[in-house]
């Protein structure tokens, strides 16, 4: 054991070196974080020590950051003290010009440059402009030439196979530098030219070069140096080295000589892993356990499709001056928080505030130079790795708590950093079956020194413009030391994010940093809202709109109108039209009857029965009598209706129509009897607007219906807003489609009658017939509709020219598609159209948005917005944390004000959960997901209960539906997850263009949503099913889609077997690299959905280039093709001679299926061991020298060659395999046919020393199963062990005789073969082929026709029956009959396919059979 004191001194020296201080300045017991040691440098120590076999991890070091604790940990744990890096001996210089591997981050950037990559088509590069004076072009050129000689990576070339090479230096050739002389150009032209240079260079992809210098000479001896570096060749630390060396060389000073190269460094890393294997394995296992639970990257508000088209970045920056930096870092260290984590936490905070979740995945690049040589820190190259942080700020209400959470996330991840973040991402992609990116990055360069050393700024000037970008990155936040302070930068992919989002986020982060630097209180106090003041003001103005509250109840307006215009029409219905006076009389009769039956003010009256015009009088009478109405329609199941009656605390019941079948436990009146009685005088008493008006029962998430209690004044706020907004009056006629159970009926009745208009009632017989609605509109010249979106969709389908009278159409209750407004404008040009938002709990509606120009709605609208709150209402969009969401951030919509319900009847707990207090007001939590636009408009984005998990991602089904509906030719869509516990996404789509197909929809959708949001199944329907309440019937959609998928026999992507030799070869290469069985990879399966990633794609391309002699194939081709079928087509299209490629593929497959012994035998046939124990027509495929073998028996007419691929698949599973050849075919064509199955079995049994290969597993297909059975009987009688018989697509022995004779005439034999489907019909038209085939088939048929076996004949071996589920000759019952012929175990398996299912499932069958051998 190393003495702790000695260990302490060594550790202190290393820490002092990292901190740039004297060792004696560090006290052994001092907290090193307080001394300036940050997380990045602590990780450097961990990496350095772990490479020397010292078992330490970041979390342990971070928990006790003192030299004293660390020395005890190291000395006690390992007995090994850290040592200095040894001086190099033989450098082992590699040859310049030889290819060498890309580093992991290099590879990621190389792949990301390709256009076919998600968020790709972008070079990782850093561009800087230095504004200085008198920079000399010739001196700069000379310095750059020497710089390129010093750092070979400035000459690097990236090769198509995913490697890199450094060509020899070009002798005396100068480094190219472009010089633009603008010294004598007008100032406005100078500015224009400089802007053009910046625009061209700041986002270019350097073509064949990785480092570019340009110099602009400006008036007054000013200069601007333009420096562009491809980050694939050099990381940020290397950039500093490059500029420092360039400045020194420009000044005539020679930097220290280098005795090591980046190429040697990479080769050393590749040749010998620098971390002990147990460490790597442990860290990989640690991440593997967490893969299923890892969160998504931050879901920030983006423009639809924006990230697919934008390739430029913009920068936001803020400089923290030295005083602010010192104050911020001192306060952080006092809390045990490193400066880097303080800045990371401020960034994480804004991500949480503007993201869909406070838990997310954050990408953290690390600068990691392994000390393999003393000169490593002077090299230029890519030394970066990455960490993925699982950041969870849930419940972290203070800055200190957030910083601790982020620091703990870093400690946890850094403690297992031997498995890098890029590998974790690839594993996560494989787990989810889709490419997962981490496009939000936080890069800390604290502790690495100033961004530009003083020598650089002295020689070249002040950096005036800096921009960086990287492939597959949307937001890269960086913190770096600059000019004595800290520079906080955001490089953001331009045009991707919603307007104003990035500016608001960046401002919030900077404000938080300044607040934390200013005082200690800011660390521990609850953080202020992220809502910018300007956004808060907009919302406050809209929430503050008021209108004079009504002092009347819902029915008061009707009775006033009845007095003012008694003869005006009030109701048009199939049961009879009513004037206001007639309707008043009916309502009074109802009120009087209820009072006579014992109704007291506030009692609840159930209204049961079908929808009729008389129901209008019923509800008016109930309200006039002081009651509360509770409707129950005829569609309610009896049990549910009775539960509603019990839960609803009903006092009386009023039945409309015939007596109902529901058991009503309260006094009941028949409406027909009430209206038929003598007119009754009833004068309504004074109304109370605060009293309850109605109780509507809606479905509950638990399955128990919940009764929403709504008071008169709440509903009146909606009614009066409606009347004011649409200027409704006595001339208006309303189509009353909604049943009383639907809250839309409140407006249909009370808004119409309060304004003096008339109601056109859609009765029970008409309410599911949109053509009847159109007739009513046309007949009665209806002017106003209050509809669900589904109803309007159905109406517009049949409306024709019958809707022109409409002038006010309000649609709400579900997604309001923009196309509804456009279609309505065509059929009713004078109609005003408004979308509304709300719920039964918000007294029908709470918000409104009127469409002003339906023909020119923005194409990216997913729906008509919810709009703005009604007067006297207020809205909030609330995050999970309870905070207000900033603009464009989705959260739960809360509604407050006059227009909300009182609660749920008899459900105080539910009422308390959904109606909450905040800021002195009661708010209803709608469960709707909404977001604010910059002008205060609310947009509905879905339902919280419609969020699902797909491939590990949280997905809003409404977003998928909205994207589908934006596609050309798509009329309507509904998305769902198929039932059964899967995460298979499916969609039902209605199209109005016959050219639109399910596949074209999926392809177009890829331009709008990420891969995991593209439905695996798209089914075209004539109409999307709706519920009676006008909402999408999601249960019915799910059932339809599930039935369609079940009908097609596939819940996943359809498996397609290879059709050509080339496709089989490509499948073999892809399957091997993915680590999958061959038959688990179909030719139409997406490589990346199967778990492929950029690294594996590179390996596939390398394999194809090498094994199939296709040097033109590039990795970009793999990303473009994605499937084996497309890849085969691409390769064939590039070949002048496609047959050559097929031949090469066949050779590859032959070799790939050979064992080492086969290869050696082929290379040296003299050494191939003879097989004297077997007849030459017993085909042997050597798989192992272990006991046990499989013996394959072909089908009738089948040759041994037909089972070559099965044999090779068995060999691939390390199984010795034999295939027998029957007489009358191939190399036994001259051998006489066997007279019987028994004789054939005996001949085969005597063909070899089978006891030497036992135990045997027999496999027979069709007739071969019968031959195998007789072979097994012979073997068991002669003491040769048989483990199992696999009977494939064959009759059981005892059933053969009853099947009758098989055909013997040539024509009938050929017809039978066509029916079985095992032979290409084209071949059967070839006379030569038929002459070879038919004699063999007829011989086998004759033997089989004479076969008979009693049902009690058994073998001891297990029998496994296997068949195809679509085999019309051998049914499941026939296969089951094999069970009677074994005294051992019996199993039955089915594969998708017909009689010759085996051709598509070779590998799966081989795995099953081979598992039986051992």
From Swiss-Prot:
Family recorded in the similarity comment: Belongs to the ATP-dependent AMP-binding enzyme family. MbtB subfamily.
Entry function: Involved in the initial steps of the mycobactin biosynthetic pathway. Putatively couples activated salicylic acid with serine or threonine and cyclizes this precursor to the hydroxyphenyloxazoline ring system present in this class of siderophores.
Domain of life: Bacteria
Pathway of action: Siderophore biosynthesis; mycobactin biosynthesis
Co-factor note (free text): Binds 2 phosphopantetheines covalently.
UniProt domain comment: Modular protein that contains an aryl carrier protein (ArCP) domain which bears a phosphopantetheinyl arm to attach the activated salicylic acid, a condensation/cyclization domain involved in the formation of the oxazoline ring, an adenylation domain which activates the serine or threonine residue into an aminoacyl-AMP ester, a peptidyl carrier protein (PCP) domain which bears a phosphopantetheinyl arm to attach the activated serine or threonine, and a terminal thioesterase domain which assists in the transfer of intermediates from MbtB to ACP1 in MbtD.
GO biological process terms on file: amino acid activation for nonribosomal peptide biosynthetic process; secondary metabolite biosynthetic process
PROSITE patterns, A to Z: AMP_BINDING, CARRIER, PHOSPHOPANTETHEINE
Protein's organism: Mycobacterium bovis (strain ATCC BAA-935 / AF2122/97)
Start and end residues of each stretch annotated as Thioesterase: 1188-1413
GO molecular function: acyl carrier activity; ligase activity; phosphopantetheine binding
Enzyme class, UniProt record, top EC level: ligase
PANTHER family: NONRIBOSOMAL PEPTIDE SYNTHETASE, PYOCHELIN SYNTHASE PCHF
UniProtKB keywords: Ligase, Multifunctional enzyme, Phosphopantetheine, Phosphoprotein, Repeat
Name the UniProt record assigns to this protein: Phenyloxazoline synthase MbtB
Cofactor annotation: pantetheine 4'-phosphate
Keyword Repeat: yes
Post-translational modifications: 4'-phosphopantetheine is transferred from CoA to a specific serine in each of the two carrier protein domains, leading to their activation from apo to holo forms.
Record region (Adenylation): 579-975
Condensation/cyclization: annotated span: 96-394
Pfam short name (any one): Condensation
Residues modified as O-(pantetheine 4'-phosphoryl)serine: 39, 1094
SUPFAM superfamilies the UniProt entry points to: Acetyl-CoA synthetase-like, ACP-like, alpha/beta-Hydrolases, CoA-dependent acyltransferases
EC number: 6.3.2.-
Domain Carrier residues, every copy: 5-78, 1057-1135
């Amino acid at each position: 054991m190393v003495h702790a004191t000695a260990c302490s001194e060594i550790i202190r020296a290393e820490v002092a070196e990292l901190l740039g201080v004297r060792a004696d300045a560090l006290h052994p017991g001092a907290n090193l974080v307080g001394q300036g040691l940050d997380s990045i440098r602590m990780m450097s120590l961990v990496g350095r020590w772990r490479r020397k076999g010292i078992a330490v991890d970041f979390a342990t070091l971070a928990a006790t950051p003192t030299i004293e604790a660390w020395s005890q940990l190291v000395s006690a744990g390992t007995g090994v003290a850290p040592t200095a890096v040894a001086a190099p001996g033989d450098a082992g210089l590699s040859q310049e010009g030889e290819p060498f591997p890309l580093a992991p981050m290099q590879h990621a950037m190389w792949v990301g440059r390709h256009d076919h990559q998600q968020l790709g088509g972008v070079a990782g590069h850093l561009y800087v402009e230095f504004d200085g004076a008198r920079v000399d072009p010739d001196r700069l050129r000379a310095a750059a030439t020497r710089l390129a000689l010093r750092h070979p990576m400035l000459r690097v070339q990236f090769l198509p196979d995913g490697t890199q090479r450094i060509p020899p230096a070009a002798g005396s050739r100068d480094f190219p530098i472009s010089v633009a002389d603008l010294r004598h150009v007008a100032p406005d032209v100078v500015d224009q030219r400089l802007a053009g240079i910046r625009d061209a260079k700041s986002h270019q992809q350097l073509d064949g070069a990785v480092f570019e210098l340009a110099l602009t000479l400006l008036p007054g001896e000013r200069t601007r140096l333009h420096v562009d570096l491809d980050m694939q060749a050099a990381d940020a630390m290397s950039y500093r080295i490059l500029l420092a060396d360039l400045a020194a060389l420009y000044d005539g000073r020679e930097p220290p000589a280098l005795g090591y190269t980046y190429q040697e460094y990479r080769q050393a890393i590749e040749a010998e892993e620098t971390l002990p294997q147990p460490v790597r394995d442990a860290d990989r296992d640690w991440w593997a356990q967490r893969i299923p639970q890892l969160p998504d990257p931050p879901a920030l508000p983006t423009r639809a499709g924006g990230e697919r088209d934008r390739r430029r970045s913009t920068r936001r920056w803020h400089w923290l001056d030295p005083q602010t930096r010192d104050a911020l870092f001192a306060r952080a260290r006092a809390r045990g928080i490193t400066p880097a984590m303080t800045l990371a936490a401020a960034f994480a905070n804004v991500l949480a505030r503007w993201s869909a979740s406070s838990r997310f995945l954050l990408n953290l690049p690390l600068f990691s130079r392994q000390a393999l040589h003393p000169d490593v820190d002077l090299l230029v190259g890519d030394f970066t790795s990455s960490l993925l942080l699982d950041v969870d700020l849930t419940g972290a209400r203070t800055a200190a708590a957030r910083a601790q959470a982020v620091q703990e996330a870093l400690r946890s991840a850094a403690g297992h950093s031997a498995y890098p973040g890029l590998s974790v991402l690839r594993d996560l992609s494989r787990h989810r079956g889709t490419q997962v990116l981490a496009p939000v990055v936080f890069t800390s360069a604290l502790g690495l020194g100033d961004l530009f050393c003083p020598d650089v700024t002295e020689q070249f000037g002040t950096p005036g413009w800096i921009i960086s970008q990287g492939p597959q990155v949307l937001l890269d936040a960086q913190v770096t030391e600059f000019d004595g302070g800290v520079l906080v930068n955001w490089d953001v992919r331009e045009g991707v994010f919603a307007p104003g989002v990035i500016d608001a986020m960046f401002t919030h982060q900077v404000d938080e940093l300044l607040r934390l630097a200013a005082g200690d209180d800011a660390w521990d106090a609850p953080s202020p809202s992220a809502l910018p003041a300007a956004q808060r003001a907009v919302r406050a103005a809209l929430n503050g709109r008021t209108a004079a509250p009504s002092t009347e109840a819902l029915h008061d307006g009707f009775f006033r109108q009845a007095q003012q215009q008694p003869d005006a029409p009030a109701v048009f219905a199939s049961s009879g039209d009513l004037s206001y006076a007639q309707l008043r009389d009916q309502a009074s009769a109802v009120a009087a009857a209820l009072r006579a039956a014992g109704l007291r003010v506030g009692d609840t009256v159930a209204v049961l029965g079908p929808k009729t015009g008389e129901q209008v009088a019923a509800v008016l009478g109930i309200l006039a009598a002081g009651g509360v109405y509770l409707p129950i329609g005829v569609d309610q199941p009896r049990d549910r209706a009775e539960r509603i009656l019990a839960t609803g605390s009903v006092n009386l019941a009023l039945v409309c129509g015939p007596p109902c079948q529901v058991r009503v436990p309260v006094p009941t009146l028949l409406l027909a009897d009430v209206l038929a009685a003598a007119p009754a005088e009833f004068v309504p008493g004074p109304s109370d607007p605060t009293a309850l008006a109605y109780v509507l029962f809606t479905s509950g998430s638990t399955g128990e219906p919940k009764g929403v209690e709504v008071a008169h004044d709440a509903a009146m706020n909606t009614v009066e807003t409606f009347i004011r907004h649409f200027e409704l009056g006595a001339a208006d006629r309303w189509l009353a489609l909604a049943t009383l159970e639907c809250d839309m009926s409140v407006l249909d009745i009370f808004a119409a009658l309060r304004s003096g208009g008339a109601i056109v009632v859609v009765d029970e017989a008409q309410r599911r017939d949109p053509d009847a609605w159109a007739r009513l509109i046309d007949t009665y010249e209806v002017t106003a509709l209050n509809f669900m979106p589904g109803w309007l969709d159905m109406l517009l389908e049949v409306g024709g020219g019958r809707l022109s009278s409409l002038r006010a159409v309000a649609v709400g209750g579900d997604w309001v598609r923009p196309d509804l407004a456009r279609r309505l404008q065509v059929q009713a040009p004078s109609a005003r159209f408004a979308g509304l938002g709300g719920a039964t709990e918000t007294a029908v509606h709470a918000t409104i948005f009127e469409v002003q120009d339906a023909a020119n709605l923005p194409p990216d609208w997913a729906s008509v917005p919810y709009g703005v709150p009604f007067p006297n209402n207020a809205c909030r969009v609330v995050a999970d944390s309870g905070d207000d969401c900033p603009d464009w951030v989705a959260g739960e919509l809360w509604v407050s004000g006059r227009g909300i319900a009182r609660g749920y009847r008899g459900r105080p707990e539910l009422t308390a959960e959904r109606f909450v207090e905040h800021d002195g007001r009661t708010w209803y939590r709608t469960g709707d997901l909404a977001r604010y636009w910059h002008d205060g408009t609310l947009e509905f984005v879905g339902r919280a209960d419609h969020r699902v998990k797909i491939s590990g991602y949280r997905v809003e089904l409404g977003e998928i539906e909205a994207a589908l509906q934006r596609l050309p030719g798509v009329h309507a869509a509904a998305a769902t997850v198929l039932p059964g516990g899967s995460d298979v996404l499916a969609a039902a789509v209605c199209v109005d263009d016959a050219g639109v197909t399910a596949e074209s929809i999926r392809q177009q959708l890829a331009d709008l949503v990420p891969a995991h949001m593209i439905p695996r199944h798209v089914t075209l329907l004539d109409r999307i099913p709706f519920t009676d309440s006008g909402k999408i019937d999601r249960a019915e959609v799910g059932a339809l889609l599930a039935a369609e998928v079940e009908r097609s026999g596939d819940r996943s992507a359809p498996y397609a077997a290879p059709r050509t030799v080339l496709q089989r070869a490509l499948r073999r290469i892809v399957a091997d690299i993915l680590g999958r069985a061959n038959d688990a990879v179909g030719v139409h399966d997406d490589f990346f959905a199967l778990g492929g990633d950029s690294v594996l794609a590179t390996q596939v391309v390398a394999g194809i280039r090498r094994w199939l002699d296709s040097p033109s194939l590039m990795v970009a081709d793999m990303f473009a093709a994605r499937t084996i079928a497309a890849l085969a087509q691409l390769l064939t299209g590039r070949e002048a001679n496609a047959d050559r490629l097929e031949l090469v593929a066949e050779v590859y497959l032959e070799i790939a299926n050979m064992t080492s012994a086969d290869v050696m035998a082929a290379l040296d046939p003299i050494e191939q061991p003879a097989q004297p124990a077997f007849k030459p027509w017993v085909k042997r495929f050597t798989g192992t020298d272990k006991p046990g073998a499989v013996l394959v028996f072909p089908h009738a007419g089948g040759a041994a060659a037909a089972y070559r691929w099965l044999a090779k698949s068995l060999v691939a599973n390390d199984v010795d395999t034999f295939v027998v050849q029957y007489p009358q075919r191939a190399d036994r064509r001259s051998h006489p046919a066997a007279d019987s199955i028994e004789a054939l079995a005996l001949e085969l049994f005597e063909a070899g020393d089978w006891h030497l290969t036992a135990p045997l597993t027999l496999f027979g297909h069709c007739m071969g199963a019968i031959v195998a059975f007789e072979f097994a009987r012979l073997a068991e009688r002669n003491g040769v062990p048989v483990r199992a018989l696999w009977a494939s697509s064959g009759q059981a022995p005892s059933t053969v005789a009853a099947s009758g004779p098989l055909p013997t005439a040539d024509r009938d034999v050929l017809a039978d073969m066509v029916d079985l489907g095992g032979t290409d019909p084209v071949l059967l038209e070839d006379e030569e082929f038929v002459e070879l085939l038919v004699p063999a088939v007829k011989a086998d048929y004759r033997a089989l026709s004479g076969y008979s076996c009693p049902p009690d004949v058994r073998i001891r071996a297990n029998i496994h029956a296997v068949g195809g589920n679509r085999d019309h000759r051998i049914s499941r019952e026939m296969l089951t009959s094999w069970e009677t012929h074994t005294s051992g175990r019996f199993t039955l398996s089915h594969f998708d396919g017909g009689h010759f299912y085996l051709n598509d499932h070779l590998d799966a069958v081989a795995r099953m059979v081979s598992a039986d051998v051992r």
